[in-house]
């Protein structure tokens, strides 16, 4: 009897679990009036739309998102034929949510042709949302009647570029925090926020602006403390937003207590970068691993080609390296790499950037990502080198294309000593020039 009762309860429980699971993974079914978006149709349905589009960025596990579902479907039915009401699973399609700086759920954005997306911050009832949409539609109609927009694309032209610009702030979680932050040698500034926090929402555009302006110089990241309770507890975060600075001592981050504006955050970050920066480095290019480490992530890599050790001796080479260290120290706050290589040690690199023969010392500014370089055209002196770095930072001017892929070979590092001159006794002129007598005899025999 007990076995029969047990069997009879298995099916309904399984069905219930399946229903709950299915509901959690798809808030909007195929019969829903809400348009379901994915990365593959986002551009055609939203960005290329000629009308107003309301987009909900949701996560299936989010309780507030589940509560909003019937309201959002009512909005879709109300605005049918007037505006498009859509939704995208931002948890499954993180690339799209990151592009638009979505950090909490649900987030509602209104896309109007010719303008950047608008964050909806009003009440989450059907009437309020619909009224907000109608307001945007009226404004769009007025602009079109006044000839201010062509209405060909949703956010076209320069505004589309601005709208789609992703945030440089890195989304951090329990799976990547240690690898990216605590185990890194780089300076990190991290915002700990909660999606429901009003101050966090106010900070969001300033944080994005600061992150984008500091890209390539200082790493900025953010942690959703509602989703990452373990990280929140680990760093004793008690209020939102909390901004911590992870400098040289990653185990003891320092709180940021300055103004919550992009300019203030940027100024503070650059000050921290200077105080946390280690000594300048100019590394010998002894193989592809050095190239990747020093130049792979650098905005610009400055490669110096120094004379053969037999020509400059150790004293001369050290003077060149002192000059390069002086230049590297001047720009150590910038995302540049500085490497050097002895004449003839990297023949393929020399060939591709037009260095070689008797043109040592030489320097080129290398942008491997763009496949371009610019050569130093003035004298190899500290002042000229510093001016060259400044000019290269402006980009474009004097750049030349690099044909093909550079082959960097593995070489032995310089031992810091003078080069050894090969004794004349170790070879004969006959070995180099051939034996004239033998050549003469062979000629006579041929005759």
From Swiss-Prot:
- Gene3D superfamilies reported for this sequence: Glutaredoxin
Pfam families tied to this protein: Thioredox_PDIA6_C, Thioredoxin
Extract the ranges annotated as region (Disordered): 146-170
Locations listed in the record: Endoplasmic reticulum lumen
Per the UniProt entry, the disulfide pairs are 62-65, 197-200
Q: Which residues are glycosylated?
A: 173
Query: Site feature Lowers pKa of C-terminal Cys of second active site: at which residues?
Result: 260
Q: What is its main location?
A: endoplasmic reticulum
Q: Which InterPro entries match?
A: PDI_thioredoxin-like_dom (IPR005788), Thioredoxin-like_sf (IPR036249), Thioredoxin_CS (IPR017937), Thioredoxin_domain (IPR013766)
GO molecular function list: protein disulfide isomerase activity
Q: What is its EC number?
A: 5.3.4.1
Q: What does the record list as GO biological process?
A: response to endoplasmic reticulum stress
| Swiss-Prot/TrEMBL catalytic activity | Catalyzes the rearrangement of -S-S- bonds in proteins
Q: Give the positions the UniProt entry annotates as the active site.
A: 62, 65, 197, 200
What the record says about the induction of its expression is: By chemically-induced ER stress response.
Record keywords: Disulfide bond, Endoplasmic reticulum, Glycoprotein, Isomerase, Redox-active center, Repeat, Signal
Which tissues express it?
A: Widely expressed.
Specify whether Disulfide bond is a keyword of the entry.
Answer: yes
Annotated site location: Lowers pKa of C-terminal Cys of first active site: 124
Where is the signal peptide, in residue numbers? 1-26
Question: Cellular component terms, GO, for this chain's entry?
Answer: cytosol; endoplasmic reticulum; endoplasmic reticulum lumen; nucleolus; nucleus; plant-type cell wall
What this chain does, per the entry, is described as: Acts as a protein-folding catalyst that interacts with nascent polypeptides to catalyze the formation, isomerization, and reduction or oxidation of disulfide bonds.
Family the entry assigns:
Belongs to the protein disulfide isomerase family.
Tell me the protein's name: Protein disulfide-isomerase like 2-2
* Name of the encoding gene: PDIL2-2
């Amino acid at each position: 009897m007990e076995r029969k009762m047990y069997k009879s309860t298995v099916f309904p429980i399984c069905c219930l679990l399946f229903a709950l699971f299915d509901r959690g993974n798809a808030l909007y079914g195929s019969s829903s009036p809400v348009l379901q978006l994915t990365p593959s149709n986002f551009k055609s349905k939203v960005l290329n739309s000629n009308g107003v589009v309301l987009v909900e960025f949701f996560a299936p596990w989010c309780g507030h998102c589940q509560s909003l579902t019937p309201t959002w479907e009512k909005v879709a039915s109300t605005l049918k034929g007037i505006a498009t009401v859509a939704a995208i699973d931002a948890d499954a399609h993180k690339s799209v949510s990151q592009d638009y700086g979505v950090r909490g759920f649900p987030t509602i954005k209104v896309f109007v042709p010719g303008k950047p997306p608008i964050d909806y911050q009003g009440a989450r009832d059907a009437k309020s949302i619909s009224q907000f949409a109608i307001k945007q539609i009226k404004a769009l109609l007025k602009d079109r009647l006044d000839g201010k927009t062509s209405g060909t694309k949703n956010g076209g032209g320069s505004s589309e570029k601005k709208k789609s610009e992703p945030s440089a702030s890195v989304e951090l979680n329990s799976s990547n925090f240690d690898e990216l932050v605590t185990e890194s040698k780089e300076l990190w500034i991290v915002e700990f926020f909660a999606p429901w926090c009003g101050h966090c929402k106010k900070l969001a555009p300033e944080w994005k602006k600061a992150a984008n302006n500091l890209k390539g110089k200082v790493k900025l990241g953010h942690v959703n403390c509602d989703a990452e309770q373990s990280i929140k507890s680990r760093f004793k975060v008690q209020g939102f937003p909390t901004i911590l600075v992870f400098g040289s001592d990653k185990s003891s981050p320092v709180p940021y207590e300055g103004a919550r504006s992009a300019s203030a955050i940027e100024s503070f970050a650059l000050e921290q970068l200077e105080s946390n920066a280690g000594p300048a480095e100019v590394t010998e290019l002894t193989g592809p691993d050095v190239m990747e480490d020093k130049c792979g992530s650098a905005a610009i890599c400055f490669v110096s080609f120094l004379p053969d050790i037999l020509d400059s001796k150790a004293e001369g080479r050290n003077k060149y390296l002192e000059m390069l260290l002086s230049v590297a120290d001047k720009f150590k706050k910038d995302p540049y790499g500085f490497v050097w290589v002895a004449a003839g040690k990297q023949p393929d690199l020399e060939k591709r950037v037009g260095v070689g023969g008797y043109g040592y010392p030489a320097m080129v500014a290398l942008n491997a990502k763009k496949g371009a370089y610019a050569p130093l055209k003035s004298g190899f002196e500290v002042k000229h080198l510093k001016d060259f770095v400044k000019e290269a930072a402006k980009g474009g001017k004097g750049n030349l294309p690099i044909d093909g892929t550079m082959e960097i070979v593995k070489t032995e590092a310089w031992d810091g000593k003078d080069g050894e001159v090969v004794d004349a006794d170790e070879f004969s002129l006959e070995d180099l020039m051939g034996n004239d007598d033998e050549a003469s005899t062979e000629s006579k025999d041929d005759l």
